[in-house]
Amino acid sequence: MARATVVERGEYFLKAVVEGVPPSLVNSLRRVIISELPVMAIDNVVVVNNTSVMYDEMLAHRLGLIPLTTPLQSLPPYEDCVSGLADPSECSTRLTLQVTAEGDTTIYSGDLASDRPDVVPVYKDIPIVKLVKGQSIVLEAYAKLGVAKDHAKWQAATASYYYYPKVVVKSENCREMCKEICRQLENPIECSFNKAWTCKDLCKEGLEVTWDKNKYVFWVESFGNYDVNTALREAFRILKRKFAVFAEELFRRASVETKV
């Protein structure tokens, strides 16, 4: 029976023990989280004036990598934005920056003003560029929904998993030898499979390390665009849609071959 037990969680982080499912399904979820969760990111920049020491291209690149809050509940599905079913204006927004330095100053991500109050920089203290007295920057930046398989600036989260390790300590000396690597050898949450195997190399026959092929420690961490609950909910929605599209195409082709 498939089951997931949460062992650690926060607003943007979750670690769980997953069991009763094949590794292909767990890996599919991991891949969707990493590369197919939609988030807002700056994609086009119109520079009106830039007298700083930074080239326009580098400035635009930095702006693109600033994570933006993404209210998925009030945005159209990403697939509708790509297909044209949704109004393009609902899938994008504008941010502006207009600064003239009165002295030595640093421009931060928090200085960007957004047309949408729910799409703003996640972190306000990301440095963009330094200005000296008299220098100025005036620009418009246009953010849109995207996914990380197209560009890393649209990556919403990272995820990983490892097989649930089964560790048997046969020598107490092994605990002392491994205390710097893993203090709780028999705790698979605190001691990952890789750490346990490193200890195995030290302890030799004093430690037995195997794994459960249908049990995993899975973790996901959001970059702040939205919380981990939203990330998982969207990942499962995308995964279900992929299964539905695959099944529909499979049945269609099977039907065509049967008629022939």
From Swiss-Prot:
Gene Ontology cellular-component terms listed: cytoplasm; DNA-directed RNA polymerase complex
Database matches in CDD domains: RNAP_D
Species for this entry: Pyrobaculum aerophilum (strain ATCC 51768 / DSM 7523 / JCM 9630 / CIP 104966 / NBRC 100827 / IM2)
UniProt cross-references to SMART domains, sorted A to Z: RPOLD
Keywords, alphabetical: Cytoplasm, DNA-directed RNA polymerase, Nucleotidyltransferase, Transcription, Transferase
Top-level taxon of origin: Archaea
Protein family membership: Belongs to the archaeal Rpo3/eukaryotic RPB3 RNA polymerase subunit family.
InterPro entries: DNA-dir_RNA_pol_30-40kDasu_CS, DNA-dir_RNA_pol_insert, DNA-dir_RNA_pol_RpoA/D/Rpb3, RBP11-like, RNAP_Rpo3/Rpb3/RPAC1, RNApol_insert_sf, Rpo3/RPB3_RNA_Pol_subunit
Name used for this protein in its record: DNA-directed RNA polymerase subunit Rpo3
EC number: 2.7.7.6
Alphabetized Pfam families for the sequence: RNA_pol_A_bac, RNA_pol_L
Principal localisation: cytoplasm
Record localization: Cytoplasm
Molecular functions (GO terms): DNA binding; DNA-directed RNA polymerase activity; iron-sulfur cluster binding; protein dimerization activity
Function of the protein: DNA-dependent RNA polymerase (RNAP) catalyzes the transcription of DNA into RNA using the four ribonucleoside triphosphates as substrates.
Cross-referenced Gene3D superfamilies: 3.30.70.3110, DNA-directed RNA polymerase, insert domain, RNA polymerase, RBP11-like subunit
Subunit structure: Part of the RNA polymerase complex.
GO biological process, one term: DNA-templated transcription
EC primary class: transferase
UniProt-listed NCBIfam families: PRK00783.1
Recorded catalytic activity of this chain's protein: RNA(n) + a ribonucleoside 5'-triphosphate = RNA(n+1) + diphosphate
